[in-house]
Amino acid sequence: MRILHVMGTLDPAAGGPSQSVRVLMSYASIGYVGEVVTFDDPEAPWLKTLAFPVHPLGPVGSTYGFNPRLVPWIRANRHRFDGIVVNGLWQYCGLAARRALSGTDTPYLVFTHGMLDPYFKHAFPLKHAKKWPYWLLAEYWNLRGAYRVLFTSEAEKQLAEESFWLHRWTPYVVPYGAKGPTGDPETMKQIFFDQCPQVNGRRYLLFLGRIHRKKGCDLLVDAFAKLAADDPELHLVMAGPDQQQWSAELQQTALKAGIAARIHWPGMITGDAKWGAFYGAEAFILPSHQENFGIAVAEAMACGTPVLLSDKVNIAEEIANDGAGFMESDTLDGTLRLLQRWIATSPREREQMAEQAAASFKQRYDMQQTAKTIIGLFEAANHTS
């Protein structure tokens, strides 16, 4: 099955969609053979080591990514693919795909990647108001024209209908997750410790993601400051790109609380260092205000690391029910309870949670199932066309 992914960027710092597409492209052995067309600059460093074909049509001059080359490119190349996957909303990708494929027999899917969560309507009402004209003129029709609109959980699918009053499309919930690590955990841990030597030989909790207000980073720093004295040997690693230049303010908060030496900021970590960070952590923590899935959650579980999540992570409830982690509200009190519950667990309870995390990952979040599902959708679409 030959599949084309259309997306704004493959930059790992852009978050989950970039990582998920990279993982999907690794499943050629089961028939998922793909290429990617992006708005990236051809000289972008993150494109240099990819093992699959990429067609960078950038650079572009805005986050929307209007590019007059994209529609003709898709029209000229669509015959090489059994189907096309549009990743994300609110960029030119979706409109270009719909225009290029109009009147053809090439099906396309739209992967929303959480971008229809009503959180954004409430957190950024002005931005939401500005999106209405584009929704009415373009984005809604991009979804209406798709063979299927993909969601990663039933909760995400239901929440999507609360963002805009026009929501007639054909939804489909796909299994989603991550690809687990391959290699020696001890070697990977040492690679991480080389990048963050302050926690070598120490106990730590791990936050791994963008340093962004949506992720609840301030809640985590404030909660850790309040409970630091309850477990004086416990450290916190805040790993991820700081796109909002916010970490300095958070570090100042830690300094005023007298715990700056126990919170560490290694920046974005990737590859073996990332897996080493997961393997070395007591638990992964994500007090996010909105998370349609959270690839880092699945990656932590793949390493047998328990996860401490807010109830706004759409998969948090099923993980808590599996005994692989804890779930609390996305508030300061909720984040405090996550830390309190973790500190109160016994070594045996932590071992059991780690075992459940690994088992739950294998049962629920193996990304190979995502690849098989997308293949099946395109097989069905082409059979009926």
Show where each model-derived region lies:
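Aromatic "clamp/platform" in nucleotide-sugar-dependent glycosyltransferases that forms part
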Residues: 89, 289
